Amino acid sequence: ARAEFAQLTGGIEPEVSAKPVVDWITAKHPLLWLALKKQEKPIVPLDIMLTRDRHILIISGPNAGGKSVCLKTVGLLQYMLQCGLSIPVSERSKVGVFSDIMIDIGDEQSIENDLSTYSSHLLNMKNMMRQAGERTLLLIDEFGTGTEPQIGGAMAEAVLNQFVKKHAWGVITTHYQNLKHYADSHDG
């Protein structure tokens, strides 16, 4: 089944480093690629590189612009890789292993646990800040949303600063201007 899926999606078994590495060339979300293939539509592959010096990628842009697809592509391919599956990337790509993959995607509000969207995100960020380290991959969609924009942006920047200090790796999507400026003015 693994070999069939690899053939179907163009997956390869790249050389894997024991250290965290994300230097992917022409990476494709395999499920999206299969769906588009059935519709005879092309997929836009992505090149993504995270390094020791630039280990967190902030993605911003308009709604329906591909931010979440990029984030989910990174998450799915990294998880597939760590499960021993072939992944659809170029043979020139470099891949590595993370000890933890932490995700905050979607709306996790809970009536049973009395959690709003924002408090759910805050709880996730608290857990991520506590557990993240230099071998952690963080995947966060719409960072800091669910509250008034100035407060959400300030909270997201404070949390991002902690992730940078802990040398965690990550892909984070946002609409907040302050996080875009943070990315331009800070290392990491």
Predicted features and spans:
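ATPase nucleotide-binding head domains, primarily ABC-like/P-loop NTPase cores
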Residues: 9-11, 17-188
